[in-house]
From Swiss-Prot:
BP terms from Gene Ontology: translation
PANTHER family (UniProt xref): 50S RIBOSOMAL PROTEIN L21, LARGE RIBOSOMAL SUBUNIT PROTEIN BL21M
Signal peptide start-end: none
Keywords assigned by UniProt, alphabetized: Ribonucleoprotein, Ribosomal protein, RNA-binding, rRNA-binding
Protein name per Swiss-Prot or TrEMBL: Large ribosomal subunit protein bL21
Length: 103
């Protein structure tokens, strides 16, 4: 059985025991999280599609790690002006292990 959930403005297709990387969620490693925004359930019989969400369906998970993504460099230069700017950015991320899908 798999589900499509929405968190952090993005959609993720998940199944039990998957580890997904999502935008930062509050909590420490080992804490339980519940995703209520379930868009689709499939795998057993007819697939269920929400409009926009499926009432009563949840996906539970456990925070594995709070981490940061790779460094992204932003570089701007104005030609012939001896003017340039270099900035770096690392996005905060959370690794979540999916423990169950509750229809």
């Amino acid at each position: 059985m798999f589900a499509v959930i929405k968190t952090g403005g993005k959609q993720y297709s998940v199944a039990a025991d998957d580890i997904i990387t999502v935008m930062t969620l509050q909590g420490e490693p080992g804490d339980a999280v519940t995703f209520d925004s379930v868009l689709m359930l499939a795998g057993e019989g007819e697939p269920k599609i929400g409009a926009p969400f499926i009432a009563g369906a949840t996906v539970s998970g456990e925070i594995v790690e709070q981490t940061r993504g790779p460094k992204v460099i932003s570089f701007k230069k104005r030609r012939r002006q001896n003017s340039k700017r270099k900035r770096g950015h690392r996005q905060d991320l959370t690794l979540v292990k999916i423990t169950g899908i509750n229809a």
